[in-house]
Amino acid sequence: MTYEYDYLVIGSGIAGLIYALQVSKYGKVAVVTKSSLNDCNTDHAQGGIAAAIDSLDSFEAHIEDTYQAGAGLGKRQVITEVISSGPKLIQYLIDLGTDFTRRDPNYDICLENLSLTMEGGHTRRRIAYAADSTGHQIMEALIARCRKNPDIEIYEYNIAIDLLTQHHVVQDEGFIPGISCWGAYVLDIIENRVDIFKARKTMMATGGAAQIYSPDTNPKVATGDGMAMARLAGARLANMEFVQFHPTAFWSPDGDTFLISESLRGEGAVLKLTDGSTFMEKYHPQGNLAPRDIVSRAIDSELKKRGEKFCYLDATNVPAEQLLRHFPSINNMLKTRGIDFTKEPIPVAPAAHYFCGGVLSTIEGITDIHNLFVAGEVACSGLHGANRLASNSLLEALVMAYKAGNHPSNLDEVQFPCIPEWKVIDEFNENEWVVISHNREIIGTIMQGYAGIRRSRRLLKYALSRLENIYNEINNFYQHNAVRKEVVETRNMAIIAIAVVKSALMRKESRGAHFLVDNPERDDEHYKHDTII
């Protein structure tokens, strides 16, 4: 089938749905998402959204914290633009129906009545939150608005396969030179059918790719689809080596991993070794509230010294009532695993969490490809530099999507070429399914072992060789079998894993989330610039 819309939105997190709501004022919108609407990183976001709201805070302080966390690679103009937009757009979320936690629950919700918490790398309390399920509260409000909007049509369980660009069509005279996007080929997972979604403007808001690591804190959908499709279509990727590991993922022997919010440390929880000793004071003046890259490396270093697999996050010094009020979801998840975090410490270890790099773009989401926009974690806007400041991710996604969608587009100028139907292959070789299932696991093992928190050029080169062979196997299967969701995802994971390793090999220094044992120091003279592939 062929569908035609003014706007195609791929992805249904905060960035995708904010953009859909904004552009629905100007035309018809399709939102395509490969799972349910709320199965996204946004819905899993516990901590909150950062903004200089408090009278004791300032834009200047938030800007400086962001720049320092980014290890000198953040773009000051972009940082300033995002941070200065924060309070206004949090008010926008409130107006849409987001129920943030209030200082005084007896009074109406407004900026002045928002309860604010502290997280790593921040010098002020500036994190607006909704208990420990901020992302879920935001998604509930956005989904309700989108479902009621007559100009937004939602296609759940549909995965985008490829962007519709010049390499899919025969060019006619009169088209804009360079690469243009006219939508995407999309697999209807339930009907097992590839459809054409033609669109004058396409927004990719597909999130990150932490699934290329094992363990990670992300939902299973975070397979780097948007980054991979953009790369296949000819867009540039930037700063892919900067993969942030969250310091405190729940650790268990069976690999049952989930995020333990940074806000817990903001409220007073302390990292300890298994013998009960503290250690973060040795690594950074902010101790337990140091930026994430520093805390993750510190934990990794201490665990390697001792041959241990986890440390503890001890919140027993925080009043139990405060813990249960602020962190009900974490409490429930821990209780099902037999842990009472008001009385005993939580076993934690770092896990892959967030991509600071992505598709090279402006803060308005403009990419190398005409009529293709990006917003959120899929993008590299210049905000995060080499390491993201806690709770700046939802802020970036919100600001980018709002800016990209808050002006009329010249829709009439976009002409569709003749787009061929998807080449259908009926054969599906079940006997070779191991190419997909096995290699998906192997990618995670390779990336964790050879391109994780600490890297060496020798192991990165070894990883690249292995990953290129894996990609060739997956792509061969993809080319000769009927398309399936898992095949598309695993292809995308291999593409992004290779991009991470290639970028890491290009940066012969240590900076932010990229630590190279061969070159453990920062080198501003030679490497204070983006890595672009």
What is each residue range found by the language model?
Residues 35-67, 71, 255-258:
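Conserved N-terminal glycine-rich FAD pyrophosphate-binding loop of Rossmann-like flavoproteins
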Residues 201-258, 391-403:
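Glycine-rich loop(s) and the adjacent beta-strand/alpha-helix scaffold that form part
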Residues 229, 235-340, 344, 407-413:
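An anion/pyrophosphate-binding glycine-rich loop and adjacent beta-alpha core
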